[in-house]
Amino acid sequence: MTRTNTLAALATETIGNYLAKATYYQPAVLKDRDPEDLHQMRVGMRRLRTAMQVFGPVLILPKSAREPDVAAIGRQLSRLRDLDVIAELLQQQYLPDLPGGEGQALQPGFKYLRQQRKRAFKQVKATLKGDRYQRLTTRLTQWTEAPNCGELGPLPAAMVLPDLTVPLLSRLWLHSGWLIATEIKRDKPQPVANLDAELIDIYVDQPQLHGLRKQVKRVRYQLQLVADQYGDRLNTDLANFQALQDILGNLQDSLVLAAFLNNAIPDWEAQLPTLKARLSQSRYQAWGQWQALQKRYLNPQYRDALRQILMVPGADATQPKAAAKSRRKTTTTAKKPPRKTPARRTAAKKSPAEQPPES
């Protein structure tokens, strides 16, 4: 994405790019040959929705081409994608390590999965061929060709970006998920150490953690929209947010998989003890990785360091000394958790003719 001077230009370019990327994958999704196409279309819709949220104060979008309309399409894609993630987890990460008897016991789960996916794909197909999707893409394309950005549009992007981005970050810092399994020490929240697996399972099942993962993803997308306006100063934070999102995703995957098995296979824990143990082990490992990042992000100096960056756009802007010192002390590149499944992989390489639109 090229750097632009006005808020209207930045908003219009961003909306246009993400609309093009999202709609690029629609024909392949309807052919249903590679789950990666669905994944990329869903990501495109999420980024388009994020752009509408970030630039909401400046956008005057046509009816049927607004953020709730994008969200409705995204929900249909998400239902199907969740089933694909379950299939990849079971087939590639867990099934190869199961004893023969447990592998057979898992087969009814795959049958149930195929039935559920058939229904979900039928809904996605109807959605992408339906009037709502067609109105959304047509009217939004027309808007990008003749954008209406209201009175704030002509303002310099650098002047307005702090007012758009800092509130987004504040909502993340105020999320209650950060306080899961913490205790107050010296007037500051600290993660509780040495929890047993049973207690960890209780904490992992709390909706606050799932909500935090979604909020981290949302903020990461939001900051990526404006990252070019800050040079390379957001790169470390974006990488750390990605690692945190992956770790929380691992915790969430185990819950989603267990819920699926409860519906697919009666008494699955008794029939699949090895799988049950593997899921528990996966949660325990991811929990330790989560607590390391949790401790970092509960540090007020670390939080303020990112806030100070967002306050001063520009590739060559100088950070306040206190913020820079805090980041040198606390910022390390977070290790991404080992992940055998391609469930959250990046876009598969395609030939030049098949590449999605460049941003």
Predicted regions and their residues:
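Cationic, histidine-enriched alpha-helical/coil surfaces that engage anionic ligands
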Residues: M1-S359
